Curated annotation (Swiss-Prot):
Protein name in UniProt: TNFAIP3-interacting protein 1
Residue numbers carrying Phosphoserine: S77, S297, S416, S455, S638
Organism per entry: Mus musculus
Residue positions, PTM Phosphotyrosine: Y565
Biological role stated in the UniProt entry: Inhibits NF-kappa-B activation and TNF-induced NF-kappa-B-dependent gene expression by regulating TAX1BP1 and A20/TNFAIP3-mediated deubiquitination of IKBKG; proposed to link A20/TNFAIP3 to ubiquitinated IKBKG. Involved in regulation of EGF-induced ERK1/ERK2 signaling pathway; blocks MAPK3/MAPK1 nuclear translocation and MAPK1-dependent transcription. Increases cell surface CD4(T4) antigen expression. Involved in the anti-inflammatory response of macrophages and positively regulates TLR-induced activation of CEBPB.
Gene Ontology annotations of biological process type: inflammatory response; leukocyte cell-cell adhesion; MyD88-dependent toll-like receptor signaling pathway; negative regulation of canonical NF-kappaB signal transduction; negative regulation of ERK1 and ERK2 cascade; positive regulation of inflammatory response; positive regulation of protein deubiquitination; positive regulation of transcription by RNA polymerase II
High-level lineage: Eukaryota, Metazoa, Chordata, Craniata, Vertebrata
Length: 647
């Protein structure tokens, strides 16, 4: 647009193209959606942590109830233990249910949702309290603990380390981004906008990498939570199986006890019935024998009862130790969970603040984009109005040029009979000059001797002489008239030539104006095409991202145009034909009327003369001139040819 015409549109948005601004805006929108997704992930992680805490508390209550049940259960009698062993032999299963630490620490495996596969056998002697920032603690596995006496040696443990210490880095990146945005907003020089946008892109890239790392960490934690949940379900199933086996064993022991009681009652009844027919001595002997048998059976049952009691005490001690370890692990997990909860709450607040700031930036950018769009629409309306004005001016100039061409042809048609009349008058003057020369030669010839008075020859000569004198006077008067006509015709022709030159100059000026308006119209059309292409690109970008509803601007809001239009020549009506009323020509042989000039012409006001061309061909030419075929607007070359035509 620069250097091509006076119509340069001022762009208040600087030299930044609209495509790059829209691309940066789309990047900001995508970053905003990504941050929203991350916020939702963090919320889901908090919900998972709450669920794991509830599950841990529930499992803790179940473990405490199991410990209470194991403490309150009384030791069984010797025959019941013997029958318990017999039941084991009958069923072929291990009825000695050992509630090892894996069952009691099921809560810890589900509660450690943020630690992953960190599993280790309990080490009660070497327990270090958690400091709230580390997430490593021991969990008793179910696969590697075969017996409670096989030592608690450490196994594979995956330490995730402290929670991500990248909050400070994120804060620094966000502070840098805020500083770059503030500098970009306060920067008066718009040429530095690309450098600021590059810095902003670098900061966004760094933030994206940090957030990607956090996403990876959260995904790892989610997978670990899922694994721990599965382990928790497996431990629950094992615990339920152990409880069912214990209930079945207790039921079988009760049944054996009732059967033994029945057998004892039957045996005592049989002994009583057998001892009745005998004497009292054998009865006393039988009683003594029964008492001895009972004492022997009691002494025999005391030995396995003492062994079972020792095993039960060992089990109780082991369960107590596991309960203490479980309480300690639960305390550590509580501390760690609280610290993690505080950290994630702090992160959530920071991310909410960042989201609010980014939303503010997005709204500001949206407002700027709307303002630029309005300015662009105003410029388009201004350019369209200017194009319409130029087109109207061009139409007026073409109409005026057409009128001037008609005027030139009309004057040409009027000039042709005048030239013919001039030729006729010149021939007549030549003839009269010849006749005058002959008359003068006759006068200058020597006169004959005077004849006698009254002779017929003298009278005829005298009459001839008088006729020649009168004819000479008449010829002199005609010559004067012809000279006057010739002088008038010459002055009229000179005046017509001057007017013709003036008309040529006016036609040249109008042609220059037409060429200038054509060039300006061409440049404006090119600008409009470029703006239409930009609009199409913008619409495509809007279709891929968010839609923008443009406000209509029907009115012309811009002020006066700062650049001046090229000066239009003052079209003053010519009054050069007012003196033509004094010219009196002799009547031509063929009187014909000529059509008057165009009545709507605002350039010339011709006097109402009755032009009478001598021939009929002129009428045909004038009719062709007055009704020309509609042609396209005159180009500079055709206008020059029209001007050079009437010579």
């Amino acid at each position: 647009m620069e250097g091509r015409g006076p119509y340069r549109i001022y762009d208040p948005g600087g030299s930044t193209p609209l495509g790059e601004v829209s691309a940066a805006f789309e990047r900001l929108v995508e970053e905003n959606t990504r941050l929203k997704g991350k916020m939702q992930g963090i919320k889901m992680l908090g919900e998972l942590l709450e669920e794991s805490q509830m599950e841990a508390s529930r499992l803790r209550q179940k473990a405490e109830e199991l410990v209470k049940d194991s403490e309150l259960s009384p030791p069984t009698s010797a025959p019941s233990l013997v029958s318990f062993d017999d039941l084991a032999e009958l069923t072929g299963q291990d009825t000695k249910v050992q509630v090892h630490p894996a069952t009691s620490t099921a809560a810890t495996t589900t509660a450690t949702a943020t630690t992953g596969n960190s599993m280790e056998k309990p080490e009660p002697a070497s327990k270090s309290p958690s400091n709230g920032a580390s997430s490593d603690f021991e969990v008793v596995p179910t696969e590697e603990q075969n017996s409670p006496e096989t030592g608690s040696h450490p196994t594979n443990m995956m330490d995730l380390g402290p929670p991500p210490p990248e909050d400070s880095n994120l804060k620094l990146h966000l502070q840098r981004l805020e500083t770059t945005l503030s500098v970009c907003a306060e920067e008066p020089d718009h040429s530095q906008l690309f450098t600021h946008l590059g810095r902003m892109a670098l900061e966004f890239n760094r933030l994206a990498s940090k957030v990607h790392k956090n996403e990876q960490r959260t995904s790892i934690l989610q997978t670990l939570c899922e694994q721990l949940r599965q382990e928790n379900e497996a431990l629950k199933a094992k615990l339920d199986k152990g409880l069912e086996q214990r209930d079945l064993a207790a039921e079988r022991l009760r049944e054996e006890n009732t059967e033994l009681k029945k057998l004892l009652m039957n045996s005592s009844c049989k002994e009583g019935l057998c001892g009745q027919p005998s004497s009292p001595k054998p009865e006393g002997a039988g009683k003594k024998g029964v008492a001895g048998q009972q004492q022997a059976s009691v002494m025999a049952s005391k030995v396995p009862e003492a062994g079972a009691f020792g095993a039960a005490e060992k089990k109780v001690k082991l369960l107590e130790q596991q309960r203490m370890e479980l309480l300690e692990v639960n305390k550590q997990w509580d501390q760690h969970f609280r610290s993690m909860k505080q950290q994630y709450e702090q992160k959530i607040t920071e991310l909410r603040q960042k989201l609010v700031d980014l939303q503010k930036q997005v709204t500001e950018l949206e407002a700027e984009r709307e303002q630029k769009q309005r300015d662009f629409d105003r410029k388009l309306l201004l350019a369209k109005s200017k194009i319409e004005m130029e087109e109207t001016d061009k139409e007026q100039l073409t109409a005026e040029a057409k009128e001037l061409r008609q005027k030139v042809r009309y004057l040409q048609d009027q000039l042709s009979p005048l030239t013919r009349q001039r030729e006729y008058q010149e021939k007549e003057i030549q003839r009269l000059n010849k006749a005058l020369e002959e008359a003068l030669s006759i006068q200058a010839s020597p006169s004959s001797p005077p004849a006698a008075f009254g002779s017929p020859e003298g009278v005829g000569g005298h009459l001839r002489k008088q006729e020649l004198v009168t004819q000479n006077e008449l010829l002199k008067q005609q010559v004067k008239i012809f000279e006057e006509d010739f002088q008038r015709e010459r002055s009229d022709r000179e005046r017509m030539n001057e007017e013709k030159e003036e008309l040529k100059k006016q036609v040249e000026k109008l042609q220059a104006q037409v060429t200038l308006t054509n060039a300006q119209l061409k440049t404006l059309k090119e600008e409009e095409k470029a703006k239409e292409a930009l609009k199409q690109q913008k619409r495509k970008a809007k279709a891929s991202g968010e839609r923008y509803h443009m406000e209509p601007h029907p009115e012309h809001v811009c002020g006066a145009y700062p650049y001046a239009y090229p000066p239009m020549p003052a079209m003053v009506p010519h009054h050069a034909y007012k003196d033509w009323s004094q010219i009196r020509y002799p009547p031509p042989p063929v009187p014909m009327e000529h059509p008057p000039p165009h009545p709507n012409s605002r350039l010339f006001h011709l006097p109402e003369y009755t032009w009478r061309p001598p021939c009929a061909g002129i009428r045909n030419q004038s009719s062709q001139v007055m009704d020309p075929p509609p042609d396209r607007p005159a180009e500079p070359e055709s206008a020059d040819n029209d001007c050079d035509g009437p010579q």
